[in-house]
């Protein structure tokens, strides 16, 4: 059974395995730089360890592959009979991280 972990990042919980690429909210790191996720909620595999609320001493290490922005989401507001129109676009930034190790 392969080892996996559930980490908290960007206000979300993400299940990760070694070698997996994940997309998370933007991190302040450049491409090629290593990042460590210390907020580990669960480590699973042979012996599953559930944190209360976090697993003590556990961490997940990954490498930033790239920074980017998601596809544009367009919002359009319209008020009838008032001649009021408003169009706004938003592109959420993200970071692509490849998981290298799960330290339990």
Curated annotation (Swiss-Prot):
Pfam families: Ribosomal_L21p. Part of the 50S ribosomal subunit. Contacts protein L20. It comes from Streptococcus sanguinis (strain SK36). The lineage of its organism: Bacteria, Bacillati, Bacillota, Bacilli, Lactobacillales. HAMAP family: Ribosomal_bL21. Belongs to the bacterial ribosomal protein bL21 family. The keyword Magnesium does not apply. GO terms for biological process: translation. SUPFAM superfamilies: L21p-like (SSF141091). This is Large ribosomal subunit protein bL21. The keyword Chaperone does not apply. One of its GO terms (cellular component) is cytoplasm. This protein binds to 23S rRNA in the presence of protein L20. GO terms for molecular function: rRNA binding; structural constituent of ribosome. InterPro entries: bL21-like, bL21-like_sf, Ribosomal_bL21, Ribosomal_bL21_CS. Keywords: Ribonucleoprotein, Ribosomal protein, RNA-binding, rRNA-binding.
């Amino acid at each position: 059974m392969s080892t996996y972990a559930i980490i908290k990042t960007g206000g979300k919980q993400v299940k990760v395995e070694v070698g997996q690429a994940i997309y998370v909210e933007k991190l302040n790191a450049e491409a090629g730089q290593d990042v460590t996720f210390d907020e580990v909620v669960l480590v699973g595999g042979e012996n599953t360890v559930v944190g209360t609320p976090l697993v003590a001493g556990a961490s997940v290490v990954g490498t930033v592959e790239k920074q980017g922005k998601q596809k544009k989401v367009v919002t359009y507001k319209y008020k009838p009979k008032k001649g009021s129109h408003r169009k706004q676009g938003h592109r959420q930034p993200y970071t692509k991280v490849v998981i290298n190790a799960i330290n339990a």
